[in-house]
Amino acid sequence: MKIKNILMVTTVLILAACSDFLEPDSLSTFDTEYVYSNVDDARKGVNAIYSYFGQDAFRSRLSNNMAGNTDIEHQSGWSNSADRYQIWDLNALPSNKDLEIVWTFAYRAIRDANISIGGILKSSAFNSSDPAISKTMHHLLGEAYTLRAYWYSMLIFYFGDVPFITEAPKAGNDFFLPKEDRNVILAQVIQDMIDAEADMLWADQTPYGIEQVNREYTLGMIARLALQRGGYYLKPDLSMAREGDYQEYYQIAKDYSKKLIDLKDRPLPTDYRQVFMNECKFITPVNSDILFEVPFAIGNGDVGWNIGITVQGGTTALHDYGSGNNYMAIPPTYYFSFDTTDVRRDVTCALYKVNTSFQEEFIGVGASANATNIAQGKWSRHFLPAPPGKSTAKGTGINWPMLRYADVLLMYAEAENELNGPTGEAQGALRRVRQRAFPESYWATKVDEYINTVSAGKESFFNAIVNERAWEFGGEMIRKYELIRWGNYAQKMTETVDGLKKLADDAYNGTGTLPDYIYWKRDANGKFTVLNPNRKLIAAPDETWTRSSFLLDLHDNTLTYDEWITRDWAKYTNGTVRYIFPIPTVGIDNSKGVLKNDGYGFGGG
């Protein structure tokens, strides 16, 4: 039975009996000593932590919606006052329900992780004389530590300093904890994972492979959170800073990414598209690119509903794949940042949607075009192995990638460069990622010459890493966290807006070389084909091609530029980006006066 199915019937007794965060009146009465006395029940106890990935807090919020806006993914927050729009527009109030959901379920996940950690450490099975039992219990402990670290990482990215709870709820505990310094929290959860990882199992040793936290993922998370701890962050006075010990954490990131490379190296799959097609087809290979992906069961998960290629469905549609939207658009500046021979572009950026007749048709980038604009092309409900039904929408069961091996390679390259400059080791890690991105016939120029050029100095190599991560992970919604820790959030947003304006001006004035119009058709097999994705054409060679406005739609005859160009990133380009949000009202109220929204310009409420 796959873990995704187990999680659908998660330990109800444990969940039902446990208290909400900062609500001490309903402590768990379940016998944790019994639960963690044996491997099978301990597994169920740890499964309770996974269950929160199936809640909206992660399924549609943290995994994608709340990770905008960036230079490669965006939405028009100013166009609506609903909760998610407030977040995109960086003006969310403490009453925002999306913030409340994330806060509440993050602390519930942390609570259940603490229950598991405490129960496992006290269990006689943890130090059993049976090596198999002891090994499994040690692995479960590592899972719990790693899952707890993930939720604290997210809380810190969105709320800054937060209460740090490391014990299971029990009578006599102080439930009204003040904020803890984010650096203290990150240092501790990193150390927890460091202490646990050596006793964990590799994905190919676990029952559920990459659908279960494994040693590969924990090693990668040590590196990822070390870069977060060593990176820049927003302080309450709205300045960006990083700690004086940041190099120590870059060293940790280097050491633990290198440890994974040394102990469990694997070639990157040569077919970049197949990495994500596997998720849409419910294929979960171990020792491949994806180290851990959230295991959504059929009927759960929003991939292919609110992220991915738009599919127009419904009861009158001529297909049975249902309906899927794309909340986060890809700006054309990102599309045109790719080298035209980079295979990742046409996987990541979908210039088409699927209509009710189950035909692929062009979508544009302006106000007059389909509102979804360029979509994340890595996932779609019409890639599913079997149509889920005309009226289906959410619940595709497509897994969500949490960490890939390509990420580990690039984290290693980044950390090595920060500490020692663009050494041969740093170049080698970058080379492995770029080699997959280009046909081998282009390696001499697009890989070797390119890397030689960007390796001229530490800064140029860092900029190459910034770009490579954009091209490699587009649509996977991790860019926001990277821009934060790099301290270049506002810079990249400004570059995006300026770039969009230039595309609009060049198309309108006829001075550009990029496609003001796109010529497209469906080939004999019904496949969407674009004649001129990279250049302007005066006319199509024959009448089989349909002409649709493309970059011309960025220009507005009244406002000069489409309104979304000047407004989607308006609060991201005027000085430091205030990416921190207020603690939601429920957190303030339940703290009995301990917590306040002080700092960050919130006024202390």
Language-model features, listed with the residues they occupy:
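Long, intrinsically disordered, low-complexity segments
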Residues: 18, 106-109, 188, 278-310, ...
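An aromatic- and glycine-enriched ligand-binding surface/loop that stacks and positions planar moieties
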Residues: 19-84, 160-162, 186, 194-199, ...
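Conserved, well-structured interaction surfaces
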Residues: 43-47, 51-57, 78-159, 174-187, ...
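Bacterial Sec-dependent N-terminal signal peptides
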Residues: 1-28, 482-485
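Flexible, polar/acidic helix-loop-strand segments at domain edges
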Residues: 336-405, 597-605
